[in-house]
Amino acid sequence: ESYVQCIEWQDQGKSTLLIAGTRDQVRDINRRFILERRSKGQSEADPAKTVALRDGLDVGRGDQIVCRKNEDDITSDGKSMENGMTFRIENVGRRDVSCVSLADGSRWEIPREFLETGCEAGYACTVHRCQGMTVDRCAVLFPSDANTPCNLQYVAGSRGKEENHFYYA
């Protein structure tokens, strides 16, 4: 249900994040989002116009990515690249990838090499990885038998600017 909710939000033009329990779940969910968006024509499917990320997934125009390390040499309007920043890809060039920040709309030119070593697909992540991320709407999937500490639930439940939804399965 959390995945379906995120797809519906994306169809409304919203940036989304699905927070899951494990890295394996996150990778599978990210792959699922990419394939779904490609099937709808919402992201680039041509392998010649995509770039491989450090998680092994290929993304292109229209896809959402998250930065996983700080990089002072990559800047936009005086602001440096920081771990947790989320972007929508606008164009994949030969050397650089044009992106828009989901947090503030700023435009970034990010070297392909950095995406290959420092970025992952940004549709899903673990609660530990979501700190610092901002999207329009967030869905949180926790196992019903887990004793998730309150501080982690707070972190997970404060990623969406407009809405945050919790699902227990």
Protein language model regions, located:
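C-terminal accessory regions
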Residues: 69, 78-169
